[in-house]
């Protein structure tokens, strides 16, 4: 093939190809201000139009490599749909996790729905309070085991504890005899467990 024939083919290909760069103008319709619009809104519209006027004409590059045997990789719609579905499922699981957490933390059953941040803060406070309760329980148990405290509580106090509505009473408190009355701190901790 001769060089002039190649040039004719490339000229013919250029006739069928869209231009590499073209100018796109935004159509802006100016309308007279209505009687309902104030002068302030008209001046805002004018400022908006002036600020966007440099963008009225801009070069948009459209390159078509199809005639040269090249193609740009296109995102597969199926892959995008699967990715979006995975993200929706992930968000749903996170939201379900927060809903479950709201049910287990104090103030979670209140009328006002707690935000995610409030739920996390409440869970942290709840865990700290439970940890403190366990630490104090371990300290009391260690004191009983070392013999510092003697298990002598009056039967009246045990009966009072059993008669309190909604208060958690251990099964061994009435079965195994009497113990010393609880200190105000220990009583407060028992009251704390009634919140839940």
From Swiss-Prot:
Q: Which InterPro entries match?
A: bHLH_dom (IPR011598), HLH_DNA-bd_sf (IPR036638), MASH1/Ascl1a-like (IPR015660)
The knockout note for this entry states: In pituitary absent (pia) mutants, adenohypophyseal cells fail to express hormone genes and some become apoptotic.
Asked if the record carries the keyword Isomerase, the reply is no
Compartments it resides in: Nucleus
Pfam families in the record, alphabetically?
HLH
Gene3D superfamilies assigned to the protein according to its UniProt record, in alphabetical order: Helix-loop-helix DNA-binding domain (4.10.280.10)
Primary location class: nucleus
Q: Name one GO molecular function term.
A: sequence-specific DNA binding
> Which keywords accompany this UniProt record?
Developmental protein, Differentiation, DNA-binding, Neurogenesis, Nucleus, Transcription, Transcription regulation
Protein origin, superkingdom:
Eukaryota
- One annotated GO biological process: epithelial cell maturation
Q: In which tissues is it expressed?
A: In the 24 hours embryo, expressed in the dorsal hindbrain in two bilaterally symmetrical lines of cells marking the boundary between the alar and basal plates, and ventrally in rhombomere 1 near the floor plate. Also expressed in embryonic adenohypophysis, telencephalon, diencephalon, epiphysis, ventral tegmentum, neural retina and spinal cord, in discrete regions distinct from those expressing ascl1b. In the 30 hours embryo, hindbrain expression is in stripes adjacent to rhombomere boundaries.
Per the record's keyword annotation, is Transcription included, yes or no? yes
Task: Region Disordered: list its residue ranges.
Answer: 33-54, 159-186
Which intervals carry biased composition (Polar residues)?
A: 33-44, 159-176
- Provide a GO CC annotation, any one: nucleus
Provide the bHLH domain boundaries.
Answer: 78-130
Instruction: State whether it acts alone or in a complex, and with which partners, per the record.
Output: Efficient DNA binding requires dimerization with another bHLH protein.
Query: What the protein does?
Result: Transcriptional regulator. May mediate transcription activation by binding to the E box-containing promoter. Involved in neurogenesis. Required for the development of neurons in the epiphysis, acting partially redundantly with neurog1 and downstream of flh. Involved in maintaining rhombomere boundaries in the hindbrain, probably via up-regulation of delta expression. Also involved in pituitary development; required cell-autonomously in adenohypophyseal cells for endocrine differentiation and for survival of a subset of cells.
Q: What is this protein called?
A: Achaete-scute homolog 1a
The protein's organism comes out as Danio rerio
Gene that encodes the chain:
ascl1a
């Amino acid at each position: 093939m001769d060089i002039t024939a190649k040039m004719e083919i490339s000229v013919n290909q250029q006739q069928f190809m869209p231009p590499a760069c073209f100018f796109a103008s935004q159509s802006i319709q100016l309308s007279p201000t209505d009687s309902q619009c104030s002068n302030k809104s008209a001046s805002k519209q004018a400022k908006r139009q002036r600020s966007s006027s440099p963008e009225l004409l801009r070069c948009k590059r459209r390159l078509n490599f199809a005639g040269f045997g090249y193609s740009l990789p296109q995102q597969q719609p199926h892959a995008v749909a699967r990715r979006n579905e995975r993200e929706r499922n992930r968000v749903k699981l996170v939201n379900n996790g927060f809903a479950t957490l709201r049910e287990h933390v104090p103030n979670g059953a209140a009328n006002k729905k707690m935000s995610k941040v409030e739920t996390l803060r409440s869970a942290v406070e709840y865990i700290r309070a439970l940890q403190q309760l366990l630490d104090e329980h371990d300290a009391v148990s260690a004191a009983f085991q070392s013999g510092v405290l003697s298990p002598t509580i009056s039967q009246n106090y045990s009966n009072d504890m059993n008669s309190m509505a909604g208060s958690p009473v251990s099964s061994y408190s009435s079965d195994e005899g009497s113990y010393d009355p609880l200190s105000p701190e220990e009583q407060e901790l028992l009251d704390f467990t009634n919140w839940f």
